[in-house]
From Swiss-Prot:
Keywords: Amino-acid biosynthesis, Aromatic amino acid biosynthesis, Lyase, Pyridoxal phosphate, Tryptophan biosynthesis. It catalyses: (1S,2R)-1-C-(indol-3-yl)glycerol 3-phosphate + L-serine = D-glyceraldehyde 3-phosphate + L-tryptophan + H2O. Pathway: Amino-acid biosynthesis; L-tryptophan biosynthesis; L-tryptophan from chorismate: step 5/5. Its cofactor is pyridoxal 5'-phosphate. GO terms for cellular component: cytoplasm. The beta subunit is responsible for the synthesis of L-tryptophan from indole and L-serine. This is Tryptophan synthase beta chain. HAMAP family: Trp_synth_beta. The modification N6-(pyridoxal phosphate)lysine is found at K92. Tetramer of two alpha and two beta chains. Belongs to the TrpB family. GO terms for molecular function: tryptophan synthase activity. It comes from the Bacteria.
């Protein structure tokens, strides 16, 4: 797909995206847009961003041939983009470094964030400590219970973790509360959104900070295999790790791009978090327009996933647009498929993956078995699974 360019000047990716917020937030978002437009044209801003990614985060993250897993499963060769090896254990820190640099540039002394699995909360607390800012992290009460290790990490890093008891007590509700807080303290507070969603300019900004993943992968796969992968695949909740991998590949027409949503118990039940795969209509949530799980009255539906980080009823607007123009295919992995993949990566590769990332390997049979052993699938291993040990143990009936 040549000459891909999005968003437009109003923050739309096709018919998705935009700016749907209260009047009180418009000035803050316009201030942010102006600051980001200035920063992205400033070579020194990007030079400092790259320095921190190298010396603080530990980039580039390697690509790794999962040879034993590939042999066991059959079909295409599986390569992993090892975002789990970043400082803080996931891809989230790529974005929080960029937004913290922008917050400092704007003179903000306090950052707030929402988090589901806790990885974005940890990454936000980390950069707040790194740059000498105070931080408050909003987290659904149910997610706090299933992600206690990350809650403690955030507190160790100096963050104030605020539990959200409203609604479904998960990521959607944490984002609601964070946006309310931003309205109340917009003058001194910078809201670090963790996913490629939210009102403009956040989806573009998060994508630009995360596309280091795909840019590195293109160079690394060329060096390691002499060519680009046949398929590049990533899990999708809001979609920041996926857009980070996909964006540099969009114009590479020979590379199939596949996003994996959370199938939960099954998309034929109410218990999933797969707006595109389930055929959800377009709606507005958290300041942007996109495919959204909702009832006939436009009320946002509850979601379910074994993975807290994918437990979200919407999807980033660029993903919805890429689905519309048929550049990216979207599929699902169910809870049981993700848990099986979690075990396989542990046993065959000595890698404990995040449950979010496990969905990608868990969806692989649908694609991989149709491919030959000389073909390559690049999997974005978006995070490590330390945070999920308690959840997996509980599901296995093991008391830690």
């Amino acid at each position: 797909m040549k000459n891909y360019h999005a968003p437009d000047e109003k923050g739309f990716f096709g018919e998705h995206g935009g700016l749907y917020v209260s009047e009180t937030l418009i000035p803050a978002l316009k201030e942010l847009e102006q600051a980001y437009n200035e920063a992205k044209n400033d070579p020194e801003f990007w030079a400092e961003f790259r320095r921190d990614l190298k010396h603080y985060v530990g980039r580039p993250s390697p690509v790794y041939h999962a040879a034993r897993l590939s042999e066991h499963l059959g079909g295409a060769q599986i390569w992993l983009k090892r975002e789990d090896l970043n400082h803080t254990g996931a891809h989230k820190v790529n974005n929080t470094i960029g937004q913290a640099l922008l917050a400092r540039r704007m003179g903000k002394k306090r950052v707030i964030a929402e988090t589901g699995a806790g990885q974005h909360g940890v990454a936000s607390a980390t950069v707040a400590a790194r740059f000498g800012m105070t931080s408050d992290v909003y987290m659904g009460a149910d997610d706090i219970q299933r992600q206690m290790p990350n809650v403690f990490r955030m507190k160790l890093l100096g963050a104030n973790v605020i539990g959200v008891d409203s609604g479904s007590r998960t990521l959607k509700d944490a984002m609601n509360e964070a946006m309310r807080e931003w309205v109340a303290r917009v003058d001194d507070t910078f809201y670090i959104i963790g996913t490629a969603a939210g009102p403009a300019p956040y989806p573009e900004m998060v994508r630009d900070f995360q596309c280091v993943i795909g840019n590195e992968a293109k160079a690394q796969m060329q060096e390691a295999t002499g060519r680009q992968p046949d398929v590049a695949v990533a899990c999708v909740g809001g979609g920041s790790n996926a857009i980070g991998l996909f964006y540099p590949y969009i114009e590479e027409e020979n590379v199939r791009l596949v996003g994996v949503e959370a199938g939960g118990l099954d998309v034929d039940t109410p218990d999933h978090a797969a707006p595109i795969t389930s055929g959800a209509p377009i709606g507005v949530l958290h300041g942007f327009r996109s495919y959204l799980m909702q009832d006939e009255n436009g009320q946002v539906l509850g979601t379910h996933s074994v993975s807290a980080g994918l437990d979200y009823p919407g999807i980033g607007p660029e993903h919805s647009h890429l689905h519309d123009i048929k550049r990216v295919e979207y599929t699902v992995a169910k809870d049981d498929e993700a848990l099986e993949a979690f075990d396989l990566l542990c046993r065959f590769e000595g890698i404990i993956p995040a449950l979010e990332s496990s969905h990608v390997v868990g969806s692989g049979d649908k694609t991989r078995r149709k491919m030959g052993k000389d073909q390559v699938i690049l999997v974005n291993l978006s995070g490590r699974g330390d945070k999920d040990i308690n959840t997996v143990a509980k599901l296995k009936g093991i008391e830690l």
